Amino acid sequence: MHHFTSTYEDYYSHGMREYPLGMRVLYSVVLAILYAFSKLMWRWDFEDADKLFDPNNERGTVIICNHTSMAEVIAIVTHIWAKGHRVRPIFKSEFNKTKIVQWAFSCVGGIPVARGTADLKSLRYAQHALQRGEDVLIFPEGTRIRTDDQPVVIHGGFAIIASMGKTTISPMAVCGFRDLTPKGSKFTKPLKCWMKAGEMLSFDDAPNGLKRKEKSEWVEGEAVKRMYSLRDELQAKHPGRK
């Protein structure tokens, strides 16, 4: 890959360690700054963080998490980077309408997905990333959940990606990040936040006798259940925080 000739598609389809040297250096510098900033500003803790990864698996894992704020994306991605992993966040293709955002998201490893469609090309990008050992970060809720009464629609498909990549799903949850930017405010508060990882899930955990589609649905449902269980556990431990 080259700085001036690489397309967005090149960034989606190539491994992050194949990016141009200058881009890799810039990526590391930016993430180091964001890691330090987020740790100082939000003082986040990551409980059971080692459960995200399987040291015996050379492939990446599909990480799923509840979504309340863009701040948690920074915390999650920089934490994974600090652990020596590379992560590819899945994001809505609507963000690509703004060229600077499209450029920025592609440079940090993001993979766009057109929701509500059979976006096979993006599924393949994610599959190949997992096979290279890169992790894939997905927020199944599809958008930030800002209030308790906001309707939530789980966007499926992450189990299919895990199946295509022949790998595991790592559920995790966040708490406190929703409180950082109150409704109507443009500035974040310096509040402590929390994250927690749960037990990995694989297709081998599904009950025997299920057909392929049924197995995928079971894995997806179980992963989401674990994700929300972790969220509820964090919220119970930190009353009043979301």
Predicted regions and their residues:
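A transmembrane-helix-recognition feature enriched in membrane-embedded lipid enzymes
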Residues: 2-50, 99-108
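Non-catalytic C-terminal accessory region of glycerolipid acyltransferases
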Residues: 2-22, 121-242
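A conditional alpha-helix N-cap/helix-loop micro-motif detector
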Residues: 42, 116-119, 151
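Conserved beta-strand scaffold positions in the cores of enzyme catalytic domains, especially
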Residues: 46, 89, 110-112, 169-171, ...
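A secondary-structure boundary/capping signal
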Residues: 48, 66, 91-92, 109, ...
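Short amphipathic alpha-helix with an adjacent loop that forms part of the alpha/beta core around
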Residues: 50-56, 128
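Catalytic core of membrane glycerolipid acyltransferases/transacylases, capturing the structured
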Residues: 55-117
